[in-house]
Amino acid sequence: MSERKRRLMVMAGGTGGHVFPGLAVAHYLQSQGWDIRWLGTADRMEAQLVPKHGIEIEYIRISGLRGKGVKALIAAPIRIIKAIFQARRIMKRYQPDAVLGMGGYVSGPGGVAAWSCGIPVVLHEQNGIAGLTNRWLSKIAKRVLQAFPGAFANAPVVGNPVRDDVLALEAPAERLKGREGAVRVLVIGGSQGARILNHTMPVVAGLLGERVTIWHQAGKGSESDTKLRYQNELSKNSVKSEYKVTEFIDDIAQAYQWADVVVCRSGALTVSEIAAAGLPAIFVPFQHKDRQQYWNALPLENAGAARIIEQNDLTPEAIADTLENWDRHQLMLMAEKAQSVAITDATERVANVIIEVAKK
């Protein structure tokens, strides 16, 4: 009889920042002969994305509470308990050797269910400030890992697992060598876009004209409006500037290869990808009570690879002045500094902890 494959259940959902790092670890362990199963929710992005990657997915019913009102808060304990029992049934049927929690609503009930079944939980916090669910789960997890220092006092810093195509990009010295002319500005508002960038960057194009070429990911439903804003600002200032606006960039590695500098939010995965790619950045952190995105971006600013502009301080002039002050020599230095702080073997580090925990 052949030996039973090791089994991992990945708990991750809701946003690309949770799902893509989970997929990176899943694919790595599949290449090592592991069987992978995913725990998610049927109405979030993992339901479409994970099966496309050849991984079987199971669902529990759970959602966030923010903005749901008093009735939802009262019903929450019952819904959470039901979700835990749904997850327990899945765990008992699949019998994983370890469970990896990468974040999203599903991780809370899934982590408790795994712990109650005696299955070791490995927790990975992608952000510089730990979310409430991960703070709770850290008390029952076998191992806790963090992408950035500061989320947990004593957890090892392993970085964020990044997609292979981003890791495969040329080093900045090769990629940026010989470039001249307009600075190539990549604008990323996250998979959902960022309205403030959609409103601000067309004005920046109007201020800088032919000095910049812009590739702008506007987010779902925002492409037409953002294109119109570019047209109006360039016409108003009687200047020309090349720009491309899309709802979503399917091949982000190609976009990083093209870019000289990135203007974006500072979600955990975005920051980690920009560091791995070796790109200078202007980060505009999403305003959250924990300032989570600010802390994500701070290591790159401290390294001299980026500038953080808080949303309250954001003006078109602030971005335009920053871009004008960064000549090509400066951009090259910043790109190399960004890559110097990247943790490029994060996938292997997380996978090795899972392998270690599963053997015990």
Swiss-Prot record:
Keyword Transferase attributed: yes
Signal sequence segment: none
GO molecular function, one term: UDP-N-acetyl-D-glucosamine:N-acetylmuramoyl-L-alanyl-D-glutamyl-meso-2,6-diaminopimelyl-D-alanyl-D-alanine-diphosphoundecaprenol 4-beta-N-acetylglucosaminlytransferase activity
Membrane association type: Peripheral membrane protein
Catalytic reaction annotation: di-trans,octa-cis-undecaprenyl diphospho-N-acetyl-alpha-D-muramoyl-L-alanyl-D-glutamyl-meso-2,6-diaminopimeloyl-D-alanyl-D-alanine + UDP-N-acetyl-alpha-D-glucosamine = di-trans,octa-cis-undecaprenyl diphospho-[N-acetyl-alpha-D-glucosaminyl-(1->4)]-N-acetyl-alpha-D-muramoyl-L-alanyl-D-glutamyl-meso-2,6-diaminopimeloyl-D-alanyl-D-alanine + UDP + H(+)
Coiled coil: none
Cellular localization per UniProt: Cell inner membrane
Keywords of this entry: Cell cycle, Cell division, Cell inner membrane, Cell membrane, Cell shape, Cell wall biogenesis/degradation, Glycosyltransferase, Membrane, Peptidoglycan synthesis, Transferase
Gene3D superfamilies tied to this protein: Glycogen Phosphorylase B
The EC number(s) this enzyme carries: 2.4.1.227
Pathway(s) per entry: Cell wall biogenesis; peptidoglycan biosynthesis
Biological processes per GO annotation: carbohydrate metabolic process; cell division; cell wall organization; lipid glycosylation; peptidoglycan biosynthetic process; regulation of cell shape
Cross-referenced CDD domains: GT28_MurG
NCBIfam families xref list: murG
Family, as annotated: Belongs to the glycosyltransferase 28 family. MurG subfamily.
Entry function: Cell wall formation. Catalyzes the transfer of a GlcNAc subunit on undecaprenyl-pyrophosphoryl-MurNAc-pentapeptide (lipid intermediate I) to form undecaprenyl-pyrophosphoryl-MurNAc-(pentapeptide)GlcNAc (lipid intermediate II).
HAMAP family: MurG
Protein name: UDP-N-acetylglucosamine--N-acetylmuramyl-(pentapeptide) pyrophosphoryl-undecaprenol N-acetylglucosamine transferase
Lineage: Bacteria, Pseudomonadati, Pseudomonadota, Gammaproteobacteria, Enterobacterales
